[in-house]
A protein has these predicted regions:
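Charged, well-structured binding/catalytic surfaces in domain cores that contact anionic ligands
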Residues: 149-151, 163, 179
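Membrane-interface helix caps and helix-loop-helix hairpins in membrane proteins
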Residues: 172-174
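N-terminal low-structure segments adjacent to metalloprotease catalytic domains
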Residues: 1-85
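Auxiliary, metal-adjacent structural segments of Zn-dependent hydrolase domains
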Residues: 73-136
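Post-HExxH zinc-binding segment in Zn-dependent metallohydrolases
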Residues: 2-4, 178-205
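Active-site recognition of the HExxH zinc-binding catalytic motif
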Residues: 156-169, 189
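Short pre-active-site segment immediately N-terminal to the catalytic Zn-binding motif
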Residues: 142-157
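Alpha-helical scaffolds flanking conserved acidic
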Residues: 109-110, 153-155, 182
Length: 205
């Protein structure tokens, strides 16, 4: 099993050095392209000529490349070495809890990153400024507006998304039916609570 951890802070810093009209291409290449198979399964295109595409989706919750400014460095700097190590340890601990029970994982490569959330986004606000997407095996996004509250819950969020990621290696994804979402979210947050305590449960329960 191999974890491919894409540390986004260096990419965000690079984006700040580029003209605005060059930023989207670099953002897509360095942060989204490793997840292209995930988006294909979700039927989300990289072709920006299609009205709903990967950048449209990113815009719902995230700080977009064109909107980045030097003022965002304070948030970017919070994606530091300790932050990435915390994510790595939470991933390994979560996955090991399944392996130790004799569960043989079908997926051997896992791509993980964290993206800057947009604090003005209604979707981000209703999620208390942090969220995740781990429903496609092998791929996990974490999204957050970095602050003490959200960073303290990033390990729990990783456990939640790992539960989704492993469960969907054995359960067919039903394109997000309400019934399946209720079951999936309940199981994932129960697992996160078991791993990191009730004090770190998310707003999804």
């Amino acid at each position: 099993m191999k974890l491919h951890l894409i540390e986004s802070d260096s990419v965000y810093r690079e984006l700040l050095t580029l003209p605005v009209d060059q930023r989207d291409a670099v953002f897509k290449e360095k942060l989204l392209l490793p997840f292209k198979e995930k988006f294909a399964i979700q039927r989300i295109s990289f072709d920006e000529r299609i009205p709903f595409n990967v950048m449209t989706l990113m815009g719902y919750m995230h700080k977009m490349p064109k909107d980045l400014s030097e003022e965002d460095l304070q948030m970017i700097n919070q994606f530091d070495k300790e932050f990435w190590e915390n994510i790595k340890q939470a991933f390994n601990r979560s996955v090991e809890s399944f392996i130790s029970k004799g569960i043989s994982l079908k997926q051997q490569d896992y791509y993980v990153t964290a993206l800057l959330g947009n604090e003005a986004s209604p979707m981000m606000r209703i999620n208390e400024n942090y969220s995740g997407d781990g429903g496609i095996p092998g791929y996990i996004f974490l999204s957050l507006v970095p602050n003490e509250y959200t960073i303290n819950r990033i390990a729990s969020a990783m456990a939640h998304e790992c539960n989704h990621n492993i469960r969907y290696q054995f359960v067919d994804w039903e394109m997000g039916s309400l019934k399946e979402m209720i079951v999936a979210e309940g199981l994932a947050e129960n697992f996160a609570e078991k791993m990191f305590g009730q004090e770190n449960i998310g707003p999804w329960v």
